[in-house]
Amino acid sequence: MEISGHTRLLCLIGSPVAHSGSPAMYNYSFEKLGLDYRYLAFDIKEEDTKKAIEALKMMNFRGCNITMPGKTVAASCCDELSKAAQLTGAINTIVNEDGKLVGHITDGTGWIRNCLEHGFDIHGKKLVIAGTGGAGTAIQIAAALGGAKKIAIFARKSSPRFANGEETVRKIREHVPECQAEIFDLEDAESLRRELTNADLFCNATKVGMKPMDDQSVIPDVSMMRPELVFSDIVYNPRETKLLKEAKEAGCKVIPGIGMLLWQGAEAFRLYTGQEMPVREVQEQYFSE
């Protein structure tokens, strides 16, 4: 489809963005469905995020994705936030609804959909989630809103981000009281073992397992891995982290992180266009080994 005066524009903003596969994935999907959209990427430093979003609004862009480091700043630029975005305090997607900028966070919904695609439904389940950074917080909030029964959050007490986890627990207790939420020190192996004993799923939402930490795992002892426990990792490079390799060897079902990347993009696509991304074709084209 040729670009015309009617073509709606979308983009990715953040820094760096040159490596991003988003433009290829979205433009392929638009072409596949015959939609008159184009998707670009702009390298925008955190301090310029507000100006960039104002410019996109002025030029009537349909919306944008935000990657690091501007996710928190971007939330403050919106006229309205989804419930998950309000509680997370950050966004990765803005949709321009006739001049009103609506902020969304699709990281958590992408993770939930990835779990579903691997046969795991979080509803009514107990989840143990390590990590209190942006992705971890988004997953914890989305899981609480999505019907998880209990969420045990683990983070290193010595880290400044432990306070993020405490704040997430407070928000879940206040806004989603039907979901039990607690936080523990990740360096307390006994607490981790105890919480895993009756958990349904463990998720690594830290950078452990990613290079240069690809020889490490957040689970210090493989005896904590019982076959009934599902293991999820948000790290997608390498595709099979040490955590997932050891979990598989212990007879556990594993959920690799690459699917979360795909499904968070698919959710943003739906918000932009009102249509479903051609996920199977995109998966084959851009996410196959």
Locate each region found by the language model:
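Short glycine-rich anion-binding loops that position phosphate/pyrophosphate groups of nucleotides
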Residues: 66-73, 134-135, 207-210, 237
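Adenosine-phosphate binding glycine-rich loop
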Residues: 228-230, 234-289
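Phosphate/diphosphate ligand-binding glycine-rich loop within oxidoreductases
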Residues: 2-118
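Rossmann-like adenosine-cofactor binding region
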Residues: 178-254
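Short, conserved loop/helix-junction motifs that constitute active-site signature segments
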Residues: 3-4, 122-123, 145-147, 219-228
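NAD(P)-binding Rossmann-fold cofactor-contacting core
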Residues: 148-176
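Glycine-rich adenosine-cofactor-binding loop
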Residues: 14, 105, 124-145, 155
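Conserved S-adenosyl-L-methionine
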Residues: 145-150, 250-253
